[in-house]
Amino acid sequence: MPSNDGMNYAPDGRPAPVCSPGDFVFAAAGLDHGHIFGMCNGLIDAGGQLRWVYDPDPLKVASFVHRYPGVEAAPSEDAVLQDASVQLVAGAAVPADRVALGLRVMDHGKHYFADKPPMTTLDQLAQARAGVASTGRKYAVYYSERLHVESAVYAGQLIANGAIGRVVHVMGTGPHRLQAASRPPWFWERERFGGILCDIGSHQLEQVLFFGGSDEATITSARVANYAHKEHPTFEDFGDVNVVLANAVAGYCRVDWFTPDGLGTWGDGRTVILGTDGYIELRKYIDVAREPTGDHVYLVDKGGEHHLPVSGQVGYPFFGALILDILEDTERAMTQAHAFAAAELCLTAAAQAVRVEG
């Protein structure tokens, strides 16, 4: 995975299968975003068997098959959906098209694993909720900046164990490198990507809910701007939002497309979680000017100051839990309510945001 390319962020984990070979079969459909590689890597490491891939672009399919030699290129989407052995379809279509794909998947009795953002409008969210209710299938979401980042996984464990007491504030920053020349046309169209708070903001707002311990939140302010890309009038290169959760935890998120060329990775993503007995800072992808590696956890508690480098130490339990949820009809990886609550918060923030001109 190129460290400078956030669009193709796909961590390589360690195999930790939760099932026997052939017990869990999945397919990939919709290759518009490189997150599909991280989604597939996680499921394969957890014991999943990748059987099919489909996309209308044969070049994308050829690249995918080269990366996963055991997968078969499907002649059509319908060939994937008609295969009764396929239990889940992972999809990273253009954001505005993700719900339509998911509805087709669930209507064929299969579970759906969508890249973030899982939809771009509140109407699409209503359709997805209705689809889940009518089919009984899961609509899982790849909020990768928590699920596929070991420092974030470890922070969740620390909080659950009471390391910093009661959480009172969560702050997340998610800067990304633009790499404009590599972006497809839909990337610049707000109607297609959903707005910056819906798109990359979804990573941060989901973490506020998770670390803050509530799926209910009120937006107190939200802003977006297009400071440096006027040639794309509907694009947004900056956004921030303040929220208050139902349990009184406060949160702040900032996202942007201004990672400078001098940074050694695609974005200096950080999270700071304040508790009554201490605080945690995550330096997810780099420790600037100190360490080129990521997954640094800084913990300050009653006992002192602690630097915990956790890369390669924690793993990514979400994927195995998702497979077991499907095989055993449970809900341990992430509740459907949480997946949709995070999406709704992002969509509401995008809709309410004041656009700053300048």
Give the location of each predicted region.
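Beta-loop-alpha module in the N-terminal Rossmann-like domain of NAD(P)-dependent dehydrogenases
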Residues: 17-19, 68-131
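N-terminal Rossmann-like dinucleotide-binding module
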Residues: 1-68
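A contiguous active-site-proximal alpha/beta segment in oxidoreductase catalytic domains
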Residues: 96, 119-181
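Mid-domain beta-loop-alpha active-site segment that forms a flexible
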Residues: 142-150, 179-217, 233-238, 338-339
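C-terminal helix-rich "cap/oligomerization" subdomain common to oxidoreductases
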Residues: 1-22, 88-90, 246, 321-358
